[in-house]
From Swiss-Prot:
It comes from the Bacteria. 5-phospho-alpha-D-ribose 1-diphosphate binds at residues 81, 84-85, 89, 91-94, 109-117, 121. It is an enzyme of class 2 (transferase). Anthranilate 1 binds at residues 81, 112. Keywords: Amino-acid biosynthesis, Aromatic amino acid biosynthesis, Glycosyltransferase, Magnesium, Metal-binding, Transferase, Tryptophan biosynthesis. Its EC number is 2.4.2.18. This is Anthranilate phosphoribosyltransferase. PANTHER family: ANTHRANILATE PHOSPHORIBOSYLTRANSFERASE (PTHR43285:SF2). Anthranilate 2 binds at residue 167. Catalyzes the transfer of the phosphoribosyl group of 5-phosphorylribose-1-pyrophosphate (PRPP) to anthranilate to yield N-(5'-phosphoribosyl)-anthranilate (PRA). The keyword Transferase applies. It catalyses: N-(5-phospho-beta-D-ribosyl)anthranilate + diphosphate = 5-phospho-alpha-D-ribose 1-diphosphate + anthranilate.
Amino acid sequence: MSNIQEALKTLLVQKNLTDDMAQKVMNDIMDGKVSDPEIAAYLMGLAAKKEAVSEIVGSARAMIDHAKTIPSEFEAMDIVGTGGDLSGTFNISTTASFIVAGAGVPVVKHGNRAASSKSGTADALEALGVTIDLTPEQATDVLANAGQTFLFARSFHPAMKYVGSIRKSLGFRTIFNILGPLTNPTRPRTMLVGVYTKELLVPLANVLSELGVQEAILVHGQDGLDEVTLTTKTDLAILSNGHIREATFDPQDYGFDYVSIESLQGGTPIENAKITEHILAGKITGPMADTAILNAALALFIAKKAQSIDAAIQLARETLINGTALGQLGALRSSSRAVTA
């Protein structure tokens, strides 16, 4: 009996797969050894049962093993979200990543084009003039030169070609929506992860711990955003050296007023790129800038660049005021172009 057949029989009776079995099945999928109908049945079986931690861990390990690797001498972090919140906001985590890198924390952002929104990370960066399709060597050079780089998921996970059309035809979230933020080829040990549903916060914190992540904050806005939100409170799962605790973040505790979700709305990649650049340049203040600051602050805090959330918020603000966040965009733009010239 093949791995996929054994897995399907297990899923048929609503039992969880071990991480070893999930890894074997994903290895077979990534090697092109599983038929489209079997892949579809497998994804449906996992989704119907709800993916277990063991299944996510095993699948993530297989995906990372099949990814192009990028060796790095830097201790870089990732700021990433699952997407799928259908909110239509501007590219919050992408904007925050420039603030974080500008504050001196190297960032390796791993992302893709939009799936359920108008503008994914790759779309926005491309509209900002950043060259997104880099080889591992080029991405490493950009990180060394700019303190920040971008790994285009489509390029670094070539084996995903075996599931792309199936995912589109199914039309619902699958385990791959969850795996995206977990499969950065650099295996960062520090992360800020946005999650589209509260029920995944603690399970994904456990997954990250199993994958070797040491410090992470997983966030889900109570308004549904897979970001730290400014419209209401944000639910958190905080991972620190294998220990996980839940918390709630309220921006009102830090002097911010709640805003409407409409005030955070973005648009096309070009429109979102303009929003990001204007926030970094200080031309946009208010709800959008404050939301980017809050997300950057939690990233700076978990990266131990600031000793408290208050100090992290102040550092994020200073990075905008003194121009280093905007300079970070310029550095990423010029460095990514230079290595591909």
